[in-house]
């Protein structure tokens, strides 16, 4: 398919954005668009400059016989902070308080545009880490983990609290649940879900006592895999927990006043490295 340079640059840009973290040979573009490799190389230089100027992401050129280009998506710090501030405002709405002091998050974590932006923000925060998979526990964390995995272009695995025959052989661990740590529960992961030696990013919607995350970390050990990091949408800072793992949060809930129907929410520690 022979294209004019302007058209060719559009389709190459679209390809890179939709195939992040994937090494693509320049020959692939040259053959597909019937252009000289030198012309494709010039296209990449222009696209790279534009992407970096508007902070869409970075293009890395890999030299050698097996070389090519790799696109790493990003988001500007200003855009990310504005998005998180908007989420903070939404989460502070008093009508989100549910019986028992829980917070309604489903509308936020089921909106594609919001999920896409959260995925970009979390992925950027871990862009220097080698990540092979994203892990979460069913069910509320699934859309969030999927969004992050899409940006990182890696698989995501779902840990379940109940055994399903469709999962095949599974590995299970016991974990402490409940804010007071007074319940022992079990979680399961299919043996086919995760390869040994994988570096895994754990993603969850809401961090309370930390028992669920600790359970997933225990599962990683059973699979001879390594924890690459923990990211949560919101952290309940009211909960007392023994710090057994580091994590990054977009939002931090500092107070839930059920009686007066008030929620105090701050921006989490996701941007601490920018300070």
Swiss-Prot record:
Keyword Ligase: no
GO MF term (any one): DNA binding
Annotated spans, Effector binding domain: 74-275
Cited Pfam families: Pribosyltran, PuR_N
GO BP: any one term: negative regulation of purine nucleobase metabolic process
Name this polypeptide is given: Probable purine biosynthesis transcriptional regulator PurR
Entry-linked InterPro entries: PRibTrfase_dom, PRTase-like, Pur/Pyrimidine_PRTase, PuR_N, PurR_Bsub, WH-like_DNA-bd_sf, WH_DNA-bd_sf
DNA-binding is among the record's keywords: yes
PANTHER family, per the entry: HYPOXANTHINE/GUANINE PHOSPHORIBOSYLTRANSFERASE, PUR OPERON REPRESSOR
Keywords: DNA-binding, Transcription, Transcription regulation
Gene3D superfamilies in UniProt: 3.40.50.2020, Winged helix-like DNA-binding domain superfamily/Winged helix DNA-binding domain
Domain notes: Contains an N-terminal DNA-binding winged helix-turn-helix domain and a C-terminal regulatory domain (or effector binding domain) resembling phosphoribosyltransferase (PRT) domain. However, the PRT domain lacks enzymatic activity and serves a purely regulatory role by binding effector molecules.
NCBIfam families: purR_Bsub
Family named by the database record: Belongs to the purine/pyrimidine phosphoribosyltransferase family. PurR subfamily.
Source superkingdom: Bacteria
């Amino acid at each position: 398919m022979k294209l004019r340079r302007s058209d060719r640059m559009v389709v190459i840009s679209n390809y890179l954005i939709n195939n992040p973290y994937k090494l693509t040979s320049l020959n692939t573009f040259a053959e597909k668009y019937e252009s000289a490799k030198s012309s494709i190389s010039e296209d990449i230089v222009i696209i790279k400059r534009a992407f970096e100027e508007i902070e869409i992401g970075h293009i890395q050129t890999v030299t050698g016989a097996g070389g090519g280009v790799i696109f790493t998506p990003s988001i500007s710090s200003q855009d990310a902070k504005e998005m998180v501030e908007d989420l903070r405002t939404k989460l502070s709405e008093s009508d989100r308080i549910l019986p028992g002091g829980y917070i309604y998050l489903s509308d936020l974590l089921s909106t594609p545009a919001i999920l896409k932006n959260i995925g970009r923000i979390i992925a950027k925060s871990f862009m220097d880490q080698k990540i092979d998979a994203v892990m979460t526990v069913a069910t509320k964390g699934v859309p969030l983990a999927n969004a992050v995995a899409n940006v990182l272009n890696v698989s995501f695995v779902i840990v379940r609290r109940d055994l399903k025959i469709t999962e095949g052989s599974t590995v299970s661990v016991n974990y402490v649940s409940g804010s007071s740590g007074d319940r022992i529960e079990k979680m399961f992961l299919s043996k086919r879900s995760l390869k040994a030696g994988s570096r895994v990013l754990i993603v969850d919607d809401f961090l309370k006592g930390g028992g669920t995350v600790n359970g997933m970390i225990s599962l990683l050990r059973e699979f001879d895999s390594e924890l690459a990091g923990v990211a949560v949408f919101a952290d309940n800072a009211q909960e007392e927990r023994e710090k057994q793992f580091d994590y990054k949060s977009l939002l931090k809930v500092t107070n839930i006043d059920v009686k007066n129907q008030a929620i105090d929410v701050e921006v989490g520690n996701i941007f601490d490295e920018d300070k």
